[in-house]
């Protein structure tokens, strides 16, 4: 007896012809709390880079976590959808026309790579991207040059990823500790003591572990989490810089401003002003 054929749900296709208006790139910066597009695929190439926050993408059936500085590259033939379970996330989304990509970038693409692989930008490049986004008038010709360069960086990271030295897997206890430190009650007050307690290790052991696996001290990790939180507050609320400083766990606004500028190259006030100008 023949078994009934069960058809898989059809996957929607986002089409270059509907989005690009004849241009080489389709560029958006999103502040997202939920996915509108759902499960979909494209007839063009795409990458997404996380500027602020964290979220999940499910790519070809595999769910991966993306945090600030992470990106994924979605080639033709892959399908994906996003899940925003950690609140608002700010994303640079770049679509590249099939013709332009295959003319300029395809020869650089690795012969074989996994679409669900998460890649990390280095801090200097991420700071550069944020600086340009905050200062560039995206209606002028500088946009295309900037996006071409960022796309080259993305493809270059894919090209060299397999050549990188394989580092030890991060221990589960350390992953769990860093994950829990994203909770506001953990990073806002007595953050270092909280991190040590969550790890169930001595501070010295924890420091050696974070430096080995993340290349950072516990306080550097804490400050990145705090500043990421503060950026979301500056983007999404009208709270004063002083209020945000205390909410993020800093004992004084001046220390907050100094740390914010060190990690982003902007003061909190100028960061908010640039965002306002960009969104107008």
Curated annotation (Swiss-Prot):
Signal peptide positions on this chain: none
- Recorded superkingdom: Bacteria
Under InterPro entries, the record lists:
Cupin_2, Homeodomain-like_sf, HTH_AraC, HTH_AraC-typ_CS, RmlC-like_jellyroll, RmlC_Cupin_sf, Tscrpt_reg_AraC-type_HTH
Q: Name one GO biological process term.
A: negative regulation of DNA-templated transcription
Q: What SMART domains does this protein's entry cite? A: HTH_ARAC
Where does the HTH araC/xylS-type domain start and stop, copy by copy?
168-274
| Keywords, comma-separated and alphabetical | Activator, DNA-binding, Repressor, Transcription, Transcription regulation
Alphabetically, the GO molecular function entries are: core promoter sequence-specific DNA binding; DNA-binding transcription factor activity; protein homodimerization activity
Q: Name one Pfam family in it.
A: HTH_18
Report if keyword Transcription is assigned: yes
Explain the induction of this protein. By N,N'-diacetylchitobiose.
Binding region for DNA: 193-214, 241-264
Instruction: Give start and end of each Cupin type-2 domain.
Output: 29-81
**Cited PANTHER family:** ARAC-FAMILY TRANSCRIPTIONAL REGULATOR, HTH-TYPE TRANSCRIPTIONAL REGULATOR CHBR
Quote the function comment for this protein. Answer: Dual-function repressor/activator of the chbBCARFG operon. In the absence of the inducing sugar chitobiose, together with NagC, represses the chbBCARFG operon for the uptake and metabolism of chitobiose. In association with Crp, and probably in the presence of chitobiose 6-phosphate, induces the transcription of the chbBCARFG operon.
Remarks, miscellaneous: Under prolonged growth on cellobiose as the sole carbon source, spontaneous mutations in chbR and nagC alter the regulation of the chbBCARFG operon, allowing the uptake and metabolism of cellobiose. The mutated regulator makes stronger contact with the target DNA sequence within the chb promoter and has enhanced recognition of cellobiose 6-phosphate as an inducer.
| Name of the protein in question | HTH-type transcriptional regulator ChbR
């Amino acid at each position: 007896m023949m078994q009934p054929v069960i058809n898989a749900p059809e996957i929607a296709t986002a089409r270059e012809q509907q989005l690009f208006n004849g241009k080489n790139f389709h560029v958006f910066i999103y502040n997202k709390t939920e996915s509108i597009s759902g499960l979909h695929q494209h007839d063009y190439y795409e990458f997404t880079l996380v500027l602020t926050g964290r979220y999940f993408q499910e790519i070809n059936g595999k769910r991966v976590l993306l945090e600030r500085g992470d990106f994924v590259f979605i080639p033709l033939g892959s399908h994906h959808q996003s899940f925003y379970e950690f609140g608002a996330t700010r994303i640079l989304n770049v679509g590249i026309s099939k013709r332009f990509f295959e003319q300029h970038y395809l020869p650089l693409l690795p012969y074989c790579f996994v679409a669900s692989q998460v890649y990390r930008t280095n801090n200097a490049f991420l700071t550069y991207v944020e600086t340009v986004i905050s200062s560039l008038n995206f209606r002028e010709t500088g946009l295309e040059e900037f996006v071409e360069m960022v796309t080259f960086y993305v493809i270059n990271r894919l090209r060299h990823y397999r050549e990188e030295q394989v580092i030890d897997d991060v221990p589960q206890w350390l992953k769990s500790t860093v994950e829990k430190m994203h909770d506001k009650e953990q990073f806002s007050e007595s953050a270092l003591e909280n991190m040590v307690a969550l790890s169930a290790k001595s501070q010295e052991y924890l420091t050696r572990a974070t430096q080995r696996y993340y290349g950072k001290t516990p306080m550097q990790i804490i400050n990145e989490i705090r500043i990421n939180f503060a950026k979301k507050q500056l983007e999404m609320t009208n709270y004063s810089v002083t209020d945000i400083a205390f909410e993020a766990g800093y004992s004084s606004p001046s220390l907050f401003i100094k740390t914010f500028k060190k990690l982003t190259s902007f003061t909190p006030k100028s960061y908010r002003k640039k965002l306002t100008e960009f969104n107008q």
